[in-house]
């Protein structure tokens, strides 16, 4: 599978992204990271299929441990909770594990194949989450959930639709970035806690790690720049866990149409 993957478009995009994100690293480091990343991407695809096809009882055994749970459990919930994540391993498995603790409202980009989209949506909701497409209705549902003091989750590392973002720094490039989470935070006073699935580099066991916490009362304003920095922090814990095959740098403040050609 790895040999096959090394000849695909996925590898080309991943290589470009890794070279941008870790331009200060030497060639040997970047090439090694690329190979390890492809292996972990294949594994994360399996994790998604596993998540969508197995019973909740089996899925509950898939995570080895949870780090910094106190960031989640000791949060004032009067204004709701925003769980910030990125496409680090399987977002489906992460959402599933988050909803074991409580109901979570999340948004996602629909899959073009209608039947597959409905299948995925149905299975994403089996553990108690409410999922909506990334559109006006979906955003409205996020606001409503926060107003009720509930939790919402979003992977905020993809290029947003036109007029739905701002240009902000991400691994040294000014890229088009969603401003939805900063907007939700500003309008609802909800606390933001970052969370992602990682793999242990020694044992390959999966674990969930809660990262930083940002509250509305803090002096520094939470914005897209702060959000992107936290996503970088998530990725840098174990860069091979990140799904580098997405064209994250395709829309930059300084246009570069040839970047993925």
What residue ranges belong to the model's regions?
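Short hydrophobic/aromatic-rich motifs at helix boundaries and adjacent loops
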Residues: 41-43, 65-66, 90-94, 112-114, ...
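Hydrophobic alpha-helical segments typical of transmembrane helices
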Residues: 14-17, 94, 119-120, 138, ...
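Membrane-anchoring hydrophobic helices of lipid-metabolizing enzymes
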Residues: 1-85, 118-122, 126-128
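A conditional alpha-helix N-cap/helix-loop micro-motif detector
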Residues: 63-65, 113, 132-135, 174-175, ...
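Short, surface-exposed alpha-helical recognition segments that flank or form part
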Residues: 6, 130, 218-222
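Catalytic core of membrane glycerolipid acyltransferases/transacylases, capturing the structured
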Residues: 79-136, 162-169
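Non-catalytic C-terminal accessory region of glycerolipid acyltransferases
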Residues: 31, 35, 73-77, 100-101, ...
């Amino acid at each position: 599978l790895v040999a096959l993957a090394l000849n695909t478009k996925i590898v080309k995009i991943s290589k470009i992204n890794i070279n941008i994100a870790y331009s200060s690293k030497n060639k040997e480091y970047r090439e090694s990271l690329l190979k390890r990343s492809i292996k972990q991407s294949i594994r994360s695809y399996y994790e998604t299929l596993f998540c969508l096809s197995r019973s909740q009882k089996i899925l509950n055994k898939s995570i080895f441990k949870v780090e910094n749970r106190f960031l989640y459990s000791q949060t004032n919930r009067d204004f709701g909770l925003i769980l910030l994540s990125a496409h680090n391993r399987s977002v489906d498995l992460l959402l599933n594990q988050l909803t074991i603790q409580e109901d979570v409202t999340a948004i996602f980009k629909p899959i073009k194949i209608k039947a597959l989209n409905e299948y995925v949506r149905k299975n994403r909701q089996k553990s108690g989450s409410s999922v909506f497409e990334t559109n006006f209705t979906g955003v409205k549902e996020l606001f409503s959930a926060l107003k009720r003091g509930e939790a919402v989750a979003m992977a905020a590392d993809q290029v947003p639709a036109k007029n739905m973002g701002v240009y902000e720094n991400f691994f040294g490039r000014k890229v088009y970035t969603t401003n939805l989470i900063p907007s939700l935070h500003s309008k609802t006073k909800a606390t933001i806690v970052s969370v992602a699935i990682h793999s242990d580099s020694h044992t390959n066991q999966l674990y969930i790690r809660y990262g930083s916490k940002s509250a509305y009362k803090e002096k520094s304003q939470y914005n897209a720049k702060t959000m992107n920095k936290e996503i970088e922090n998530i990725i840098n814990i174990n860069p091979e866990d990140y799904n580098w095959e997405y064209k994250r740098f395709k829309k930059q403040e300084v246009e570069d149409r040839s970047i993925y050609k």
